[in-house]
Amino acid sequence: MKILITGVHGFVGSNLVKALSEEHTIYGLDIVSPVKDGVRYTFSWDYLDKEDGIPEVDAIIHLAGKAHDTKNKTVSDVYFKVNTGLTQKIYDYFLTSKTAKKFIFFSTAKAAADKVDGILTEDVVPSPVGPYGESKIAAEKYIQEHLVDDKQVYILRPCMIHGPGNKGNLNLLYGVVKKGIPWPLGAFENRRTFTSIENLNFVIEGLLTKDVPTGIYNMGDDEALSTNELIEEICKSLGKKAHIWKLPKGLMTGIAKIGGALHLPLDSERLRKLTENYISSNAKIKKALGVEKMPVDARTGLEATLKSFK
């Protein structure tokens, strides 16, 4: 199978190339186009407008996008220009392709909901908060408004993706624990769904090779983990004893309010993000792929990621 991957030089793109390149021919589409092992050739975006600019492919995986800026420094228009605009451009190209029959769009769980009561399923009425989620849901809507019968389209809503070499939020938390700083939020009981890169690769391979119905699919590991469990796993990987303090919730909430006024590292929003529940169901994608469980459990995937931080 010939596959075009946008954002091929990013973390997820690089891992998909490793997972798919032995059995498939991979082409890239990115803002930079250096030589990359496993990729036949990487094109720049202007090649979409050229006649015979990009070879005909069988499937397109659209990863390119503006990631969520947790510091809120990105102008909202940038999110819509990239996350919505580029999606429209590559999807229009897909619709005109004579050979491409499968399109996989990486949206985000945040397009569905910023907060989750209970378990998040694909049936939820989307209520994104902020330009990141809003730009992703706008891209989803455009795709859904332009579906065609002879092509299969998959909109994926993954929870936080991690894996070896990923320098994201887990790496930041790892750095805090490595310094020996006690975790003061042990009194908060929460559970969150994560997406191990091995499970992501498994899902993509299945969507490419199996006859899966067009639709929206949540993506995540089978097991949800608490922040306290994350701290324990990080300490385990470092060979350290976990120092988890169960300080009163009211005290920590008050400190967070003061922190917001004084621009300290812990404010009310960050406290919410660190202690809220965000559980997403992956039952629909497993049923579509004909499997009962993901190949890698959440803890095993986390261990592999943490090991790479050393």
Residue ranges and their predicted role:
Residues I3-E23:
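N-terminal Rossmann NAD(P)H-binding glycine-rich loop of SDR-like oxidoreductase domains
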Residues K89-P131, Y154:
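Conserved Rossmann-fold NAD(P)-dependent oxidoreductase catalytic core, especially the SDR/UDP-sugar
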Residues S44-G85, K89, Y93, A111:
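NAD(P)H-binding glycine-rich loop region in Rossmannoid oxidoreductase-like domains
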Residues I197, E232, I255-E292:
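Conserved C-terminal active-site "lid" loop/helix of NAD(P)H-dependent oxidoreductases
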Residues N166-L172, G186-L208, T214-G215:
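Substrate-positioning beta->alpha
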Residues K284, E292-K310:
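Amphipathic terminal alpha-helices
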Residues K210-L266, L302-L306, K310:
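Mid/C-terminal beta-alpha module of Rossmann-like enzyme folds, strongest
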Residues S127-Y154:
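Active-site Tyr-X1-5-Lys
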